[in-house]
Structure formats: structure tokens, C-alpha cells
Amino acid sequence: MKNIIKTIVAGGFIVGMTALISSCVGEKFHVEGTIGNAQDSVLYFEHNGLTGFTTVDSVKLDEKGAFSFAGDKIDNPEFYRLRIAEQIINIAIDSTETVKVTAKYPQMATEYDVNGSYENEKIKELALKQINLQTQCQALYNHQPEVADSIVEVLVQTYKEDVALNYIYKEPMKAYSYFALFQFIVVNNAARLIFNPAKDAKDNKVFGAVATSWDTFYPHSERGQNLHNITIKGMRDDRIA
């Protein structure tokens, strides 16, 4: 159980540098914009690969807060983040697009605008939903600890039904659907996966839908293979149980 959770958490927000190295030379994507109220803060542009986070670039912001980062295009969607301290904006890249972000520190994680990318508009929606779920759960544990566990279960199930129906199953080939698979909340100082194929056969079917779709649209990608490994492990565990 611990091994699959580590694999899942790493897989979502964590493809290796091999894919980056093999990307098309010369073709670039761009992430640019402004972060207000962040003078002298260091803005990091980080790649979120299967094996962890790596810093692609960084910049010390001036009073205007302007930034511009670029990276090599690869053949499947990849995930990055803009970060100042603990404030994070998740970004998906699936082409040589230019993604424009405007935000204001220190609320950049929740109050930002992203333009030029349908995928990233959806990722913002999902990120805000996740933050709202986390806030509700934390409030329950703070103020109603005696009933928190049961109510949190209902909230999580409702969240999963909404996201699976209105996001993942609608467009399982999209980067935002992959992103949704690996969302989590923190309960009692421990990360809890929202979709957990190691514990719930229905969740494993959701993973399987994205894995199958990525096989079709992004054959031989490391992320697609990782999804398959997780799904197969979940099926085996379910049969054993």
C-alpha cells in the first residue's frame, strides 16, 4: 500500500528528464506574465516530473513583477509550476503555446488569471475546487472533530463524482484530467489522495480511463505507462482483496 501511494503521488506531481532531453530541438513553449506585490521575491519555474520537482529557471522580481520562462516542447503534456515560497500556480504544457499568467502575491495560488490555454483554465478550476475541499475538511476537524471523519467521507465522495463526471470522463486525454487524478487533501497532517486506486475499485476505473486515452493520444509516454502500472496494480490488489 505504501509503495503504490508513493508511486501515485510521485506520478502526479512528480516525466523524467529523459523525455525532456528527447524533445524536439528548437521548438519552445513560453510561460510569461506578472506577479504583483512581489518585489525582491524569487519566482521559481519548476518541472513536476515522475521522480520529483526540478528547477528549470528562476528570477528575482522587480517592482513590475514581470517574468518570462521558456522550455523545450515534448510530445505529451507536461506539468510545471510557478512558485514563490509556498504559493503555487500549476501549469500544464502540451504544445509550443504561450501561457500568460497574472497574479498578485501573497494570494497568487487562488487569485490568478491564466490566458492562452484552455487546459490551464481547467486546471485553475480544479485547483480552486481542491482548495475549497481542503478548507471545508480542515474546518470540520477544527470545530467538529467528533463527526469530522464521516462528513469528510461524504465531501470527498461528492467531490470525486463531480470531477470524474464533469472533467475526467469528458476529456480523459487532456492534461487537466491527468492533473485531477493526483489531487489530494491533508488530513491529520498526512496527505490523502482524493482518487485512490489502491483502496477504491471505482477510482481505479477512473485512472484506467485516462491511461487508455493517453495510450491512444500519447503512445509510449512515460506518464501513460505510469498510469497503466498504477491501474494494473489496483486491479491486482482488488482481486486479492
Label every model-predicted segment.
Residues 1-13:
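Bacterial N-terminal signal peptides that target proteins for export
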Residues 19-23:
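C-terminal motif of bacterial Sec signal peptides marking the signal peptidase cleavage site
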Residues 24-167:
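A non-transmembrane, solvent-exposed segment enriched in polar/low-complexity residues
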Residues 131, 135, 172-193:
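Amphipathic alpha-helical repeat scaffolds of TPR domains
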Residues 146-151, 190-202:
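Short coil/turn connectors between adjacent alpha-helices in alpha-solenoid helical repeat scaffolds
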Residues 166-171, 217-220:
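Flexible helix-coil transition and linker loops at the boundaries of alpha-helical arrays
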Residues 198-241:
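N-proximal helix/coil linker or "cap" segments that precede and/or mark the start of modular domains
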